[in-house]
Regions:
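Conserved catalytic scaffold of divalent metal-dependent phosphoesterases
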Residues: 100-208, 243
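Phosphate-binding glycine-rich loops of NTP-binding sites
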Residues: 438-461
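Accessory, non-catalytic peripheral segments of nucleic-acid enzymes
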Residues: 265-416
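Beta-strand-turn-beta hairpins that frame and shape the catalytic cleft
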Residues: 1-4, 11, 16, 123-137, ...
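Active-site environment of divalent metal-dependent phosphoester hydrolases
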Residues: 10-15, 56-59, 88-102, 142-146, ...
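Core catalytic region of metal-dependent phosphoesterases/phosphodiesterases
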Residues: 19-127, 212-220, 228
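Conserved beta-sheet core of the metallophosphoesterase superfamily
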Residues: 191-269
């Protein structure tokens, strides 16, 4: 039994150029959708799973929403139904998938008996030409609903409560499974220990997570996840995978191949073996260019002489450059953008300095330097020496003396170091004091509204 596993389509407008009123990044996404359909028409899978986040934005204008729903149906969902025995469409997160959009899809596809749309947790048996298969569907939900029952809860505890709820839900659904029939879980959540597209690892408390032990305890043969945009095999005994997004969505996806999984369930003694293969898609690549001070100097001297060649062609580019302070002043960033565009860059997202070298340390002022020292350093930095420097110092001397006669020297300069504060807190109307004497590092904790911030604000005021 072959199972096509995709998700995180994010159909909609993305940051990028437009042509004839059409967002070209949206067309990139549609191109990836069509590529999946073409592969599916060749493979003819028994089950195709769309594991959530079919759309990119939940809240959009009516005309945009209708265009997204129409393209999702005409160019993706309906064609998949035409070449798959069964198609599973899972609701993702509330900020991407709109419940009303899914209601519209349900009404528009009432005649498609092989399309199964899940907006609530469920277990369902589907019949394919290779035999029956059970689908355990665990769509995303809005954890903000829990705030009605636990007002004032902090984010970490909210995540832990939602985590407990989701894992208990999965274990409850597992009791409905018939273990004589292959079972596939599809869910749109973070799995504990999974790797995000930026390389960080999700742990319990940071998000609503499904535990690998819960996946194993569910007793399914395969778990097909959406939500994390980096394709990966998860750390559970049960074969479990993130399909990843179909296209690169931002620079966190740079260098990561995107596509979809094709899983094959093969009956064997004591269960089902799973063989999985990853199929790439024609994604739009992101590329970060880092320019050295030498390259920046070349742009300053002769912008026309700089070329990036095929490196940037058809890619979304961001530029990070390092240079001196003088080069930063002389650099025209538009010259960099022109060079990238001339070499075929699809879109230049940003051009920003990564490191601008300031004056040498010997030229830096300190809190011990007075006006005369500052003037001397300025003259030295600007190569003003000899008689001209002496003349400027002589002209400046009476002005500096008049501005600073030394009477308040040292009284209003230096670091602000609090020793002790005594205030009447306007939030709680209580007397409060705090001694900083023995403190090197401190954290002010407490529930919202007790006056943590005002303790210090009142003291400053």
């Amino acid at each position: 039994m072959r199972i096509l596993h995709t998700g995180d389509i994010h159909l909609g407008d993305l940051a990028g150029p437009t042509k004839d009123g059409e967002n070209l990044r949206r067309l990139d996404t549609i191109g990836c959708m069509k590529a999946i359909v073409e592969d599916a028409q060749s493979i003819k899978p028994e089950v195709s799973i769309i594991a959530g986040d079919l759309f990119n934005r939940s809240r959009v204008w009516a005309d945009t929403a209708l265009d997204d729903v129409n393209d999702a149906l005409e160019k993706f969902v309906i064609p998949l139904c035409g070449c798959s025995d069964e198609v599973v469409l899972l609701f993702g997160t509330m900020n991407h998938d709109n419940p009303r959009a899914f209601e519209l899809i349900k009404k528009a596809t009432e005649n498609l008996s092989n399309l199964h749309i899940y907006t609530t947790p469920a277990v369902e048996k589907l019949d394919t030409k290779e035999g029956p298969v059970q689908i355990m569907a665990v769509p995303g939900f809005d954890k903000a609903r829990l705030r009605l029952f636990y007002p004032g809860m902090d984010k970490e505890q909210e995540n832990r409560n939602a985590t407990a709820l989701i894992n208990d839900t999965i274990l409850g659904l597992a009791t409905q499974l018939d273990h004589s029939i292959p079972a596939v879980m599809t869910a749109h959540y973070t799995v504990n220990g999974s790797e995000a597209d930026n390389g960080s690892t999700f742990l319990a408390g940071q998000d609503v997570v499904i535990l690998p032990s819960t996946i194993d305890a569910a007793g399914v043969d395969l778990a097909c996840f959406g939500h994390i945009h980096k394709p990966q095999r998860l750390a559970s005994e049960t074969p479990a995978y993130y399909c990843g997004s179909v296209n690169q969505l931002n620079f966190n996806d740079e260098g990561t191949e995107h596509g979809f999984w094709l899983h094959t369930l093969q009956p064997m003694m004591g269960g089902n073996a799973v063989a999985s293969g990853f199929i790439g898609l024609p994604e739009r690549e992101h590329l970060t260019l880092r320019l050295s001070p030498d390259t920046v100097a070349q742009f300053v001297a002769d912008p026309q002489s700089v070329s990036f060649g095929e490196l940037v062609r058809d890619k979304i580019i961001r530029v990070r450059y390092s240079c001196t302070a003088e080069q930063e002043k002389a650099l025209n960033r538009a010259d960099i953008q022109k060079a990238l565009t001339a070499d075929g860059a699809f879109y230049v997202a940003e051009i920003v300095p990564e490191d601008v070298e300031e004056l040498d340390s010997k030229d830096q002022l300190t809190e011990h330097d007075g006006p005369f020292e500052a003037l001397g350093r300025w003259l030295e930095h600007n190569d003003i020496t000899g008689d001209k420097a002496d003349r400027l110092k002589a002209l400046a001397e009476p002005i500096i003396k008049k501005a600073d006669d030394g009477r308040d020297d040292g009284k209003h300069t230096g670091a602000f170091i609090p020793h002790k504060i005594e205030v009447k807190n306007y939030r709680s109307y209580t007397e409060a004091e705090f001694d900083f004497g023995p403190v090197r590092m401190a954290m002010a904790n407490g529930q919202n509204g007790v006056g943590k911030s005002s303790l210090f604000m009142d003291a400053i005021a």
